[in-house]
From Swiss-Prot:
The protein's name in its UniProt record: Transmembrane protein 237A
The gene coding this protein: tmem237a
Protein family (similarity comment): Belongs to the TMEM237 family.
Record-linked Pfam families: TMEM237
Residue ranges crossing the lipid bilayer per the database entry: 198-218, 239-259, 273-293, 326-346
Length: 377
């Protein structure tokens, strides 16, 4: 009875082994399909990450298809082997099931590691650029826009550390006007000097003409060899004071203007100009000499102005020639000096050393009261 019971129990074990093997083969077959594809995708992603060339879609080559076909043939071979054993008589040790389960676990672990590496090194389809790169324009990237700017009727005012747009009205134009800087001492000196130089140029020319006219009138009234001096006194005594006053005024302005060109603020520079016969220095010297000579004959001009027929104390008879001859000669010399000085000035009217000195002068600007308050704030 014991033998028969054991014999009855043994055939019941064999179909269980077949089922276990069939289940294992079914587990292996679906897992064997995507494995090579995953491996190829991992290799392709690694190659794309290692090469720094622009990403372009790579066409699917035939090698993965061949591998799939090989895998399919392998599965067909496995099925053929299973068909060779219709009865399911497979000579395997009882530990084959445990080894298959261990292999499946290892394969799953390897698949998990490959999936993680594929996720880390893989390239998404959105990152692949299929379009051809457009050529970059040769213009600079920071070039100014070609469109013209148009004025707008708004002004941005900073309030509470923020810029706010406000409408620009005519009432607020005065507030946004540019404030002109205040004049300093140098600016005032430059303006005064330029204005006085224009007046001086006019006085130089007018003095030269007036001195020549004055000496011509005196010689005409005195006659040849000064024989008609009483006629000169009678005709010229009403013009003596105005003529001499105007001559003195023009000589004073011309002398100051000539010395103003020499820049007497630097004595060494002025002395060098006199020694080198500079035109501005020579003109100033000639005007100064003419002014001194004109002042030396001021008493004679007073006598001519006070000439009466009844006053014999100022003009005793017979002394007209002795009094008037030096006065006429001095006026002639003054006319010559003034004319020569005007020629020197006219040759170089733009030469002005004082203006150059003022331009090079540095002025210390002191802060205003408004600036002090701003600095304190």
């Amino acid at each position: 009875m014991c033998v028969t019971s054991r014999a009855d129990k043994m055939p019941s074990v064999k179909p269980k082994k077949k089922k276990i093997k069939k289940e294992i083969n079914e587990v292996e077959e679906p897992e064997a399909g995507p494995e090579p594809a995953i491996e190829m995708e991992g290799l392709e992603s690694r190659r794309q990450s290692e090469s720094r060339e622009p990403l372009t879609p790579e066409p699917h080559d035939n090698p993965p298809l061949k591998k799939k076909k090989k895998k399919k043939t392998h599965t067909f071979e496995n099925e053929g082997e299973q068909q060779d054993h219709p009865n399911g008589d497979v000579q395997e040790s009882p530990t084959d099931g445990e080894e298959v389960t261990k292999k499946s676990k290892k394969k799953r672990k390897n698949k998990m590691m490959e999936n993680q590496s594929h996720n880390e090194l893989g390239v998404e389809e959105d990152d692949i650029i299929t379009d051809v790169h457009a050529p970059i324009s040769q213009r600079s990237l920071f070039s100014a826009p070609l469109s013209h700017s148009h004025p707008i009727g708004k002004v941005f005012v900073e309030k509470n550390r923020r810029f706010q747009a406000t409408d620009l009205s005519h009432d607020h134009l005065e507030e946004y006007m540019e404030v002109r800087p205040m004049w300093n001492t140098r600016d005032v000196a430059m303006r005064v000097h330029s204005g006085f130089r224009i007046i001086g140029l006019f006085s130089h020319g007018f003095l030269a003409g007036y001195a020549v006219w004055n000496i011509i009138v005196v010689y005409v009234l005195a006659g040849e060899q000064m024989t008609t001096l009483p006629n000169l006194l009678q005709q010229y005594h009403s013009l003596a004071y105005p003529a001499q006053s105007l001559l003195y005024l023009l000589l004073a302005i011309s002398t100051v203007s000539a010395f103003d060109r020499v820049n007497l603020a630097k004595a060494s520079m002025a002395l060098r100009g006199f020694l080198t016969l500079d035109p501005a220095a020579l003109a100033s010297f000639l005007y100064f000499a003419a002014l001194i000579l004109s002042l030396s004959q001021q008493m004679t001009s007073d006598r001519i102005h006070l000439y009466p027929t009844a006053n014999e104390t100022l003009w005793p008879p017979g002394l007209e020639h002795q009094i008037l001859q030096p006065w006429i000669v001095v006026n002639l010399v003054v006319a010559l000096l003034v004319g020569l000085a005007w020629v020197f000035v006219a040759t170089r009217p733009d030469m002005d050393y004082t203006e150059e000195f003022l331009m090079a002068m540095e002025v210390e600007e002191y802060p205003r009261h408004d600036d002090k308050h701003e600095l304190a704030a």
